[in-house]
Amino acid sequence: MFIDGKWIIRDDIDVFDPYTLKNIEKITALDREETKNAIEITEKNKEVMKNLSPSKRYSILMKIAEQISLKKDLFAKTISIDVGKPIKQSKIEVDRTLTAFRLSAFYAKELRGETINSENGLIFTKKEPLGVVGAITPFNFPLNLITHKIGPAIATGNSVILHPSSKAPIAAIYLTKIIEHVLKQMDIPRGVFNLATGNGDIVGDEISKNDKINMVSFTGSVEIGESISKNAKMKKVTLELGGNNPMIVLKDSDIKLAAKSAVKSKFLNAGQVCISVGQVLVEEEVLETFTKYIIDETKNLVLGNPLDTKTDIGPLISPESALRIENLIKESVNEGGELLIGGNRQNSLIFPAVINIDEDNLLSKIETFGPVLPILKVKNSEEAVSIANNSKYGLQAGVFTNDINKAMKIADSLEYGGIMINSSPTFRKDNMPFGGVKKSGLGREGIKYTVEEMCETKTVVIHNI
């Protein structure tokens, strides 16, 4: 809807506040031909970005961060209304966004090749942009996850076409207005950055298939990620997909700390986080104590209006999502799960649920993407690792123990992209490598690592000069 410096305004898709269920915006849905045109414009402007000096790319990113910092409250409120995320969590997302843009700016100046010794001449390498990056982003972090794609893309001199989730596109629209302002201020053609709103099965599909796209960076579900990977053919692809992220609690750990961490992490953004705790595997000697702490902590959570600073858990993104979670809870109980607390639904709200299950229960195998915390009893760390690895996912895992030798042995044994010791799987910093194995994805995010993904290495050899 922002193509070649022009806004295309139509009332094609309704956007709803998931808490009030009121219509808050109408956005444009590009059709396939419009999407192809947007990609073509992005491709025509790739040389503009490539030829910008590192200092100019740095300035673009720092100016974007500066403008966001002046509108922090607006962005936080927008995220809370658009997604249903509690305002205190939305403010953290805005702060992380600023960090990610500033880190991207730093790496714009740090991009460099190397010199290789040779007796036959001079060998050196250059880092060059890929060309056109297609960024496809989800609803749950509608500002920060965009930044993790477009920040490194700009830093490395790529032109960008962004396709945000149509469920929560407003933060992306506000961000695009800032980018428009910065590009105009710096006298850079606006066609280097294009915003393509609409339905994923049209816009996202075309971005993944189109030959003018050099790289697709996607965050979302496994099913769509697999489709993008298939469509992309020889394109470079990074996929940050789902997970059922285990948290192992051993009897020698700080049980109360582990329980607090599990509750805080599981119910962040109503469980709509790809690295949310998927299941807690607890040694049987401390299961009763751990479960008591979990229930006590869960009872203290405040459910309600995302704009209230006291709220800990807001709604899911839609009533349909909440109904899906309600049905998953019922199915889990039918399979023998014991519901200890919560699980009731009111429109898009789900009261945080805690369920005792075994490893054959469906909640041990899937990504719930909702406020449901499954607890499993295990005999020892070996059984915990075995259950954790018996999964198609491999995003992040957490281990609580006071024995560093056990911790390192378990970290070596777990088949996951990231292992958090004495922290939940939900831990993430914007400058650390982030990504999964197995069905949880391809490639790594984290600004430095995304910068590496968005470059090509060119080798130059000089003889006899």
Curated annotation (Swiss-Prot):
It is an enzyme of class 1 (oxidoreductase). GO terms for molecular function: lactaldehyde dehydrogenase (NAD+) activity. Keywords: NAD, Oxidoreductase. The active site is at 240, 274. It comes from the Archaea. It catalyses: (S)-lactaldehyde + NAD(+) + H2O = (S)-lactate + NADH + 2 H(+). NAD(+) binds at residues 220-225. Its EC number is 1.2.1.22. InterPro entries: Ald_DH/histidinol_DH (IPR016161), Ald_DH_C (IPR016163), Ald_DH_CS_GLU (IPR029510), Ald_DH_N (IPR016162), Aldehyde_DH_dom (IPR015590), ALDH-related_metabolic_enz (IPR051020), Lactaldehyde_DH (IPR053404). Pathway: Cofactor biosynthesis; coenzyme F420 biosynthesis. Gene3D superfamilies: Aldehyde Dehydrogenase, Chain A, domain 1, Aldehyde Dehydrogenase, Chain A, domain 2. It holds the Pfam family Aldedh. Belongs to the aldehyde dehydrogenase family. PANTHER family: ALDEHYDE DEHYDROGENASE. Homotetramer. Involved in F420 biosynthesis through the oxidation of lactaldehyde to lactate. This is Lactaldehyde dehydrogenase. It comes from Methanococcus maripaludis (strain C7 / ATCC BAA-1331).
